[in-house]
């Protein structure tokens, strides 16, 4: 069963509207980004989504384990999505916290899977100027050689959501293509995506 994540949530009113939609995961960005949230914001947003039985994911880039653990505890995160490599030792510590770990692999022209990955799932995103939220896709045919479950991110919107589904991804991670001019998630665009996925 395909699941959906919407990333880059930062506004509480927007979150209250989003919480009613049939979306499984919501992401809060703790790394440098226009969508970055403070711990206090994340804590408030978590409460909104948990009230509707949604899962919340913290997005990290270079943060150390101590910082990540603090965010997990204070913002009551269900999982983390991380752009740096997680070591076996860190993964074991995170498992004790009862959070899932998604390791991001930034893709340009090939899948860079040389090193061992310690995570519950791999998330493939397009390599861009920012670590995520660039609104660009990579060549999804590269995923044909990957045989394990994965998450797909990067430039997914109404124009290519069916193509994204055809990659076989277990979770689609959507962000910038669902925003209005104020950087808020556009509820109507999300409803259109949900309607399209029922076809």
From Swiss-Prot:
InterPro entries: Aldolase_TIM, PRAI_dom, RibuloseP-bd_barrel, TrpF_fam. Pathway: Amino-acid biosynthesis; L-tryptophan biosynthesis; L-tryptophan from chorismate: step 3/5. Its EC number is 5.3.1.24. The keyword ATP-binding does not apply. It catalyses: N-(5-phospho-beta-D-ribosyl)anthranilate = 1-(2-carboxyphenylamino)-1-deoxy-D-ribulose 5-phosphate. It comes from the Bacteria. Keywords: Amino-acid biosynthesis, Aromatic amino acid biosynthesis, Isomerase, Tryptophan biosynthesis. It is an enzyme of class 5 (isomerase). GO terms for molecular function: phosphoribosylanthranilate isomerase activity. GO terms for biological process: L-tryptophan biosynthetic process. HAMAP family: PRAI. Belongs to the TrpF family. This is N-(5'-phosphoribosyl)anthranilate isomerase.
């Amino acid at each position: 069963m395909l699941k959906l994540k919407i990333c880059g949530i930062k506004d509480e009113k927007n979150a209250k509207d989003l919480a009613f939609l049939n979306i499984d995961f919501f992401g809060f960005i703790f790394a440098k980004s226009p969508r970055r949230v403070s711990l206090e914001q994340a804590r408030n947003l978590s409460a909104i989504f948990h009230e509707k039985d949604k899962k919340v994911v913290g997005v990290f880039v270079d943060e150390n384990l101590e910082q990540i653990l603090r965010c997990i505890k204070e913002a009551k995160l269900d999982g983390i999505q991380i752009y740096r490599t997680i070591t076996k030792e860190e993964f074991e510590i995170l498992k004790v916290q009862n959070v899932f770990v998604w390791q991001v692999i930034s893709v340009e022209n090939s899948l860079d899977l040389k090193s061992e990955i310690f995570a519950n799932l791999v998330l493939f995103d397009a390599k861009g100027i920012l670590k995520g939220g660039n609104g660009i896709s990579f060549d999804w045919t590269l995923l044909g050689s990957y045989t394990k479950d994965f998450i797909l991110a990067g430039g997914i919107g109404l124009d290519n959501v069916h193509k994204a589904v055809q990659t076989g991804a277990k979770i689609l991670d959507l962000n910038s293509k669902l925003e209005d001019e104020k950087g808020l998630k556009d509820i109507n665009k999300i409803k259109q995506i949900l309607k399209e996925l029922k076809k």
